[in-house]
Each structure stands twice: as structure tokens, then as C-alpha cells.
Curated annotation (Swiss-Prot):
Gene Ontology CC terms: plasma membrane
One Pfam assignment: COX2_TM
Protein name (record): Probable quinol oxidase subunit 2
Subcellular location: Cell membrane
Residues carrying lipid (N-palmitoyl cysteine): 20
Broad EC category: oxidoreductase
Protein's gene: qoxA
Membrane-topology descriptor: Multi-pass membrane protein
InterPro entries: CcO_II, CcO_II-like_C, Cupredoxin, CuRO_UO_II, Cyt_c_oxidase_su2_TM_dom, Cyt_c_oxidase_su2_TM_sf, QoxA
Similarity comment: Belongs to the cytochrome c oxidase subunit 2 family.
Region (Disordered): 317-374
Length: 374
């Protein structure tokens, strides 16, 4: 068998094997995912029809108008009909793709129906983990999410460090979580089961392991789970701060109480840096630091007091939730500013030293070029 045939056979086998995989996007378990599945299939079929028509016309023109002996070359003339077709048809294609896409996208942003009481969950990304706070149930989980079937879930997406993207392929598309703000995303599971969720936006060496499990259960089972979760260890500020340290272990944890008792990440984006200092954690480049040295200075217990905050909105309004207003910790802010000023001065010294060194080298070179002054 020739090398070309072998490669062709291998390529064909790979294409056939790809059909054996379970593509989560096409295995929809919620209304949003079902709408997106329809859009994807609609767009693929629509574009395949266009490709088929174009290739067919291409083949016809090649054979019908190919060069023949003694044939005369045609002359180009103005043709209003053809010009109208090649301007109007692309516009109609864009409209046919845009209308269902825009309509579906706007439907995603609609709030839950009034007769359906939504479950509110704060999904917070930090340290290659996902924290899920249930403010009404007063529980919190890490890297695992439990939701009731057929009940809308209003996710309040936040990030405490890098920009990430919250994505549960079988329930709906991704949406970004960013520092200093809260993004809303409503999803519903219409089937029971366990689904996979992940961060779909690259954010560092732990990106591939920033995943979580989603358990869709009946309302009765959800109520039982909430009751059991309330009996777990209470989430203290010390415990939460330590959980903020970057880790790719992907452990699943459950606590009673939530971090929202002492911080709203959207209103206090610098909180995580103070948490690092409490446990003497210093961010290092993993490409130039041995794994055992990344956390060798981290303390088991905090070496600084917890950051004091004052919550003025503890009830978390359920629709259009306003962020909590946090009072600044003057002592911490002053320390942080002093450190920033110190680092800025150090950088200026280094920059000045580098400029002086370059000037000295240039002066020496000019001196040598002129024969050392002789």
C-alpha cells in the first residue's frame, strides 16, 4: 500500500472514530443548551448547503466554459441581474443566520419567569477552584455543584484573581467571570444526572484542572442535601482565606455558612492579596520554581488578622442583586499603599542604575574608540 493511501486510511479512521465520542455540546440537558444545539446544527446545515451550491457551480463552470481549441475568448459585459444576485444573496445569508442567533442570545438574558422561584448561587473563581455559595441556604461548596431539576438557577459569576469563564456544556454556553464585577447567567437542568463544568478561559498552569461536577437532583433530594450540608463544618474566614491559595488538587468540599458573611469579591477585588499575606504565600513563576518550593513558606495558621469588613446588604436581593458595600480597612490599605510605594521606589532605583550603567559603558566605548584619549 502506498504512503498516500496509508495516510488517507489513517485520516479516514480518525474521522470515523471521532463520531464515537460523546460530544457534550450535542448532549443537551437543559433548555439553553438545547437552543444552542439547534443553532449549531442549523448553522452547519445552512453552510453545508451553501458550500454544496458553490462547489457544484464551480464544477459546472469548469467543464462548461473550459478552454477549447479554436474557441473565442468571451467578452465581459455589464449584467444587472448577476450583479444583483451576488450582492443580495450574501445579505440574505447573513440575515438568515443572524435572526435566529440574535433572538436566541437575547432569550438567554431574560430573567426567570415570575412563577418559578430561582435558586441563587454565587459562582466564584479563585486559585484554580470554583466556590459555590448558596446565600439563601447558607451553605458553600468547592468544585462541586448541586442543583434541583427544572428549577432556574441564577448564577452570580465573580472572580477573585484572573479572568475565567464559567461553562457547563450540557446546560449552556460559557460566560466570563471577572474581578470587580458580577455577571448574571441563568441556567436550568431539565434532566437528572451528573454533568461536567469547567473554566474555558486559559488562566495559567492550573487551567486544565479547574473543573467541577454538577449534580442535577429532584427538589426533595436537593432539600435533603441542603439539610446534610448545614451539618458540615462551618466555613470560617481563616478556612476560606487558605482555600484561596492556588491549588490544582481539585478537592470537593462542603461547608455550612458562606464566604459572603465576610466578603463580596466584586466589591473588594484586593481581598485575595491580603489572604495570601495571611498565610505567607508568595506567587512565583512555576516555570522557574521547583514544585516543592512553591508552597514551602506557606504557614498552616494565619500570621495576620482577618481583613475586617462591614456588610450593609446581608439579605442579598434576589433579582438584580446589588453588591454588598464594604468598609475599607484603613490599616491594611495604608500598609498596601506603603508597600506599593516602596516597590515603585525600588523599581526606579533599578531603572536608574541600569541607565547609569549603560551610560558608563557608552562613555567607555567612546573613550576607547578615540584611542583612549591619546
Amino acid at each position: 500500500m502506498s504512503k498516500f493511501k496509508s495516510l488517507l486510511l489513517l485520516f479516514g479512521t480518525l474521522i470515523l472514530l471521532s463520531g464515537c465520542s460523546n460530544i457534550e455540546v450535542f448532549n443537551a440537558k437543559g433548555p439553553v443548551a438545547s437552543s444552542q444545539k439547534f443553532l449549531i446544527i442549523y448553522s452547519i446545515i445552512f453552510m453545508l448547503v451553501i458550500v454544496a451550491v458553490v462547489l457544484s457551480m464551480f464544477a459546472i463552470f469548469i467543464f462548461k466554459y473550459s478552454y477549447k481549441k479554436n474557441s473565442e475568448s468571451g467578452k465581459m459585459h455589464h449584467n444587472s441581474l448577476i450583479e444583483t444576485i451576488w450582492f443580495v444573496v450574501p445579505i440574505l445569508i447573513v440575515i438568515a443566520l443572524a435572526i435566529p442567533t440574535v433572538k436566541t442570545l437575547y432569550d438567554y438574558e431574560k430573567p426567570p419567569e415570575k412563577d418559578k422561584d430561582p435558586l441563587v448561587v454565587y459562582a466564584v473563581s479563585a486559585g484554580y477552584k470554583w466556590f459555590f455559595a448558596y446565600p439563601d441556604q447558607h451553605i458553600e461548596t468547592v468544585n462541586t455543584l448541586t442543583i434541583p431539576k427544572d428549577r432556574p438557577v441564577v448564577f452570580k459569576l465573580q472572580s477573585m484573581d484572573t479572568m475565567t469563564s464559567f461553562w457547563i456544556p450540557q446546560l449552556g454556553g460559557q460566560k466570563y467571570a471577572m474581578t470587580g464585577m458580577t455577571m448574571n447567567w441563568t441556567l436550568t437542568a431539565d434532566q437528572l444526572g451528573t454533568f461536567r463544568g469547567r473554566n474555558s478561559n486559559f488562566n495559567g498552569e492550573g487551567f486544565s484542572r479547574q473543573t467541577f461536577k454538577v449534580h442535577s437532583v429532584s427538589q426533595n433530594d436537593f432539600d435533603k442535601w441542603v439539610k446534610e450540608a448545614k451539618g458540615k463544618k462551618t466555613l470560617s474566614q481563616d478556612t476560606f482565606d487558605k482555600q484561596l491559595l492556588p491549588s490544582t488538587s481539585n478537592k470537593e468540599l462542603t461547608f455550612s455558612g458562606t464566604h459572603m458573611a465576610f466578603v463580596d469579591p466584586a466589591a473588594d477585588p484586593e481581598y485575595i492579596f491580603y489572604a495570601y499575606k495571611r498565610y505567607n504565600f508568595e506567587q512565583k513563576d512555576p516555570n522557574f520554581t521547583a514544585e516543592e518550593d512553591l508552597y514551602k513558606d506557606v504557614k498552616d495558621k494565619p500570621i495576620k488578622p482577618a481583613r475586617k469588613v462591614h456588610i450593609t446588604n446581608p439579605n442579598y436581593e434576589r433579582h438584580g442583586m446589588k453588591p454588598m458595600i464594604l468598609g475599607n480597612n484603613e490599616k491594611y490599605d495604608n500598609e498596601f499603599k506603603k508597600e506599593e510605594d516602596h516597590n515603585s521606589k525600588e523599581m526606579e532605583k533599578i531603572s536608574k542604575g541600569a541607565k547609569d550603567e549603560n551610560a558608563s559603558k557608552l562613555h567607555k566605548k567612546e573613550h576607547d574608540d578615540h584611542g583612549g584619549g591619546h
